[in-house]
């Protein structure tokens, strides 16, 4: 909590207090000047602040929703079905976790170019659907939380695979997809410039605010204000979801 409090404190400090040593947690003369300067800088931008924000909200909401749905649907057969090549597929997923996104930038660019998605928000949203971490996480949750006897009982009662997935599996792995939601929101909300986005009006809020942070020493306080703004959404989502995650973990602890 200390680094978070220090960032908030720095965003409320005038410039002459930012470089004091040792640093003070509570400003002597708290001010919102850094936030006013940030608003002034953004108002002078070629692209309105609302457009950066709208792009970020779209990318975060659609990317997170698609990621949760696709990861869960792919994890279900890997966790609860027995078919040839199942372990090979899972091993490939684990190996894919060893590589960073930088390794696949060139191949991803070639795919985006072939699909005509260069300079489109789809080039950020669609790759977010296929994160291997989400698939791995949901598979582990389903294996540990969902007993096979529960699924078998649902089949005996005449439930279809689709109904089993949406009515039984997803509610019982709520803690898993809420955790995945937190990770996805944090990643997408804070995603900076994409190599596939060229037009200024299609860039995200993180890119615009990072440009402000790079303005130099005179904007150090503004940089702290930027960090506070970028942390607001992930922290809010965490606070809202925390109790639900704990409740879901407690209520979904079923045994054979």
List the model feature ranges, each with a label.
Residues 1-256:
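A hydrophobic, multi-pass inner-membrane permease signature
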């Amino acid at each position: 909590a200390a680094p978070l409090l220090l960032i908030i404190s720095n965003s409320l400090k005038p410039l002459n207090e930012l470089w004091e040593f040792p640093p003070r947690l509570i400003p002597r003369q708290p001010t919102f000047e850094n936030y006013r300067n940030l608003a002034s800088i953004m108002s002078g931008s070629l692209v309105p602040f609302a457009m950066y924000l709208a792009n970020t909200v779209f990318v975060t909401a659609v990317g997170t929703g698609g990621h949760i749905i696709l990861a869960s649907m792919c994890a279900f057969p890997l966790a609860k079905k027995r078919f040839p090549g199942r372990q090979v597929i899972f091993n490939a997923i684990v190996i894919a976790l060893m590589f960073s996104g930088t390794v696949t930038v060139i191949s991803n660019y070639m795919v985006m170019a072939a699909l005509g998605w260069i300079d489109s928000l789809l080039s950020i949203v669609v790759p977010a659907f296929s994160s291997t971490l989400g698939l791995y996480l949901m598979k582990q949750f389903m294996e540990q939380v969902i007993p096979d006897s529960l699924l078998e009982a649902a089949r005996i009662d005449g439930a279809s695979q689709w109904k089993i997935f949406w009515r039984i599996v997803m509610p019982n792995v709520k803690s898993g997809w809420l955790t995945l939601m937190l990770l996805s929101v944090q990643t997408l909300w804070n995603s900076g410039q994409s190599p596939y986005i060229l037009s200024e009006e299609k860039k995200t809020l993180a890119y615009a605010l990072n440009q402000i942070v790079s303005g130099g020493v005179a904007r150090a306080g503004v940089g702290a204000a930027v960090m506070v703004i970028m942390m607001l959404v992930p922290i809010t989502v965490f606070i809202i979801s925390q109790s639900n995650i704990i409740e879901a973990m407690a209520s979904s602890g079923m045994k054979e």
